[in-house]
UniProtKB/Swiss-Prot annotation:
One of its GO terms (molecular function) is structural constituent of ribosome. NCBIfam families: PRK05309.1, uS11_bact. Gene3D superfamilies: Ribosomal protein S11 (3.30.420.80). One of its GO terms (biological process) is translation. Keywords: Ribonucleoprotein, Ribosomal protein, RNA-binding, rRNA-binding. The lineage of its organism: Bacteria, Bacillati, Bacillota, Clostridia, Eubacteriales. Part of the 30S ribosomal subunit. Interacts with proteins S7 and S18. Binds to IF-3. The gene is rpsK. This is Small ribosomal subunit protein uS11. It comes from Pelotomaculum thermopropionicum (strain DSM 13744 / JCM 10971 / SI). Located on the platform of the 30S subunit, it bridges several disparate RNA helices of the 16S rRNA. Forms part of the Shine-Dalgarno cleft in the 70S ribosome.
Length: 129
């Protein structure tokens, strides 16, 4: 019995002008996701995906490279302007925003959406080094 040749569905080029860049910056990594205004993902990248491993993922330079990679892919879909939503306390917050601007995207809005508990879960005990 012969196998059927299946072709991978080629990603169609959407023509999206404006979108939202979500930057999640933790102490260990930075993840940049670019979506349209409805929330559908156009492109994403992270410090680990760009090629950094271990403690180098948490550097501002790794965040810059991740944002640049995501922006380049999004601009292929016709993206021109973004609103930036930043979440988390990591080192790559500002570097990622600057990199999006340097890549050629127009940043309209920068908003901090870091979740803050209203006295929710008990935090882990303090480290003693």
């Amino acid at each position: 019995m012969a196998r059927r040749v299946t072709r991978a569905k080629k990603r169609e080029r959407k023509n999206i002008v404006s979108g939202v860049a979500h930057i999640k910056s933790t102490f260990n990594n930075t993840i940049v996701t670019i979506t349209d205004t409805k929330g559908n993902t156009i492109s994403w990248s992270s410090a680990g995906q760009v090629g950094f491993k271990g403690s180098r993922k948490s550097t501002p330079f790794a965040a810059q490279m991740a944002a640049e990679s995501a922006a380049r892919e999004a601009m292929e879909h016709g993206l021109k302007e973004v609103e930036v939503m930043v979440k988390g306390p990591g080192a790559g917050r500002e570097a990622a925003i600057r990199s999006l601007q340097a890549a050629g995207l127009e940043v309209n809005l920068i908003k901090d959406v870091t979740p803050i508990p209203h006295n929710g879960c008990r935090p882990p005990k303090r480290r003693r080094v």
